[in-house]
Amino acid sequence: MSRIGNKVIVLPAGVELANNDNVVTVKGPKGELTREFSKDIEIRVEGTEITXHRPNDSKEMKTIHGTTRALLNNMVVGVSEGFKKELEMRGVGYRAQLQGSKLVLAVGKSHPDEVEAPEGITFELPNPTTIVVSGISKEVVGQTAAYVRSLRSPEPYKGKGIRYVGEFVRRKEGKTGK
């Protein structure tokens, strides 16, 4: 039995959900998200409650059931509250700048790295070494933050690089002399 799939999703005020043959559109104060779901899972909307039902208890149906419910919940939370990921830069001379919707990173290379914000994503810089990636789609926010991190992921000897705020970076001991 999928415990996640059986949880009811409550629609907050100001959020509308339209289900057209398992193509679900969620509209809210922050924007609109559309996603196509498996035809095997039935999505029911009763007032302000959304439930997902599976036809049988096979292993495949259980996994699709839980995933469908989680994706629906992420859509509802995204259009009502939004998602954000914070990254911090550590290293001498490592800094970020905004040029319009483009993020320009100086991370110890011979050239600055430029990251164009995907549709629906905004970059914020509270200070030159902190980057906040925000948007309504949890998936796109996570992918964008992971891409920015991959431009200079933290190295284990000095810890220099771009990391998520609160991320633990395993440190190694350097070579010992003779």
Swiss-Prot record:
Coiled coil: none annotated. Pfam families: Ribosomal_L6. SUPFAM superfamilies: Ribosomal protein L6. One of its GO terms (biological process) is cytoplasmic translation. GO terms for cellular component: cytosolic large ribosomal subunit. Keywords: Ribonucleoprotein, Ribosomal protein, RNA-binding, rRNA-binding. InterPro entries: Ribosomal_uL6-like, Ribosomal_uL6-like_a/b-dom_sf, Ribosomal_uL6_a/b-dom, Ribosomal_uL6_bac-type, Ribosomal_uL6_CS. GO terms for molecular function: rRNA binding; structural constituent of ribosome. Belongs to the universal ribosomal protein uL6 family. NCBIfam families: L6_bact. Part of the 50S ribosomal subunit. PANTHER family: 60S/50S RIBOSOMAL PROTEIN L6/L9, LARGE RIBOSOMAL SUBUNIT PROTEIN UL6M. This protein binds to the 23S rRNA, and is important in its secondary structure. It is located near the subunit interface in the base of the L7/L12 stalk, and near the tRNA binding site of the peptidyltransferase center. This is Large ribosomal subunit protein uL6. It comes from Streptococcus pneumoniae serotype 19F (strain G54). The gene is rplF.
